[in-house]
Amino acid sequence: AKTLFPYTTLFRSDCYSYPATLRNELQEQLGTFPLFSFWGPNANIKSTQWIADASIYVDKKYNPTLNLIYLPHLDYCLQKFGNDFTKISKELGEIDQVVKQLVDHFESVGAEIILLSEYGINPVNQAIHINRFLREKGYIAIREERGLELLDAGASEAFSASDHQIAHIYIKDKSKIEKIKREVSTLSGVKLVLDKKEQEAYHIQHQRSGDLILIADDNAWFTYYYWLDDAKAPDFARLVDIHRKPGYDPVEMFMDPKNPFIKLKAAYKLARKLSGFRYLMNVIPLDATLIKGSHGSPFVEKQFYPIFVSSNESEKELEPVDVFDEILKKIF
């Protein structure tokens, strides 16, 4: 997937390929990649189906040695509703049909098949507003623009880059690491706080990792929210805008359920877009309690672990780093 940003400020769906000519070939055969079905409130099976169709097309025409195919569909419903099967049965049926299509094709050409989870998603019911906590402690610097607040990371004593059940806290004055570690350890929902030395045990002591890495309890996850008053939230907070938010925002999958006219508003914005006018699709809520599924903690129950399915029998559990070798065994 790729987004085009022409000077009109409108952005358009596209895809990237190598060689570059494959992009035009795929979009001539299958249509433009449905980016707006890939993420956001309108995320649906269309993007996953396009990826599957493109994979089969490439395999038939070019016969690559290895196909790595990403099917994102369950990422949406499981984060929105957790493992509430009364709410996700439709999505489960849809992905089942796409997987069947792929398996049927690759079995017909004698390929070895692996079904692999990128991660497992477990139920959550608690949002941890780590940047709000750091702000209340006086560590976060805010710049106000047109009455709205922007996080000034460079001027902040400490701030968090949040990602699902993991939060990286970057600290300007290294002498304050222990103090901040003690403070964030008291937060409800925080299971573990790792300094650089402690990160070594989990093999995550990268030079760009946070001075502190926080891991949430099984039922909790970290937001990026830093404002204390929704009226001062930045304009991009209510948009699907993955580039400007200082952290992951799964609430982008929802339209504001508290606004009874939200679908009419979205339709009006879409009409402006289709007419070539500038528009702001500010329909995303600021309610983190909507999220019912997350991932990232290594401490969840085994039923929520990712899976590795192949034709080889095995009794052992795989470590993530073992997957590479398992794939190579299928090739050589």
Question: What do the PLM-derived regions correspond to, one by one?
Answer:
Residues S55, T65-P72, I88-I95, V99-L102, ...:
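Beta-strand elements within well-structured catalytic alpha/beta cores of enzymes
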Residues N44, D84, I88-E91, K316:
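Alpha-helix N-cap/helix-initiation motif
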Residues L290-V309:
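Short glycine/proline-rich, acidic loop/turn segments that cap or connect secondary-structure elements
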Residues P6-G82, S156-A161, Q165-I171, K176-K179, ...:
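His/Asp/Glu-rich, glycine-adjacent segments
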Residues A1-L4:
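Short, exposed "boundary/linker" segments that immediately precede the start
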Residues Q101-A288:
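Secreted, luminal/periplasmic, and some membrane-associated catalytic domains
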Residues Y7, N63, G110, D163, ...:
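A structure-centric signal for secondary-structure junctions around beta-strands
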Residues T8-E28, S89-Q97, R132-L151:
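Acidic, His- and aromatic-enriched active-site or binding-groove loops in soluble protein domains
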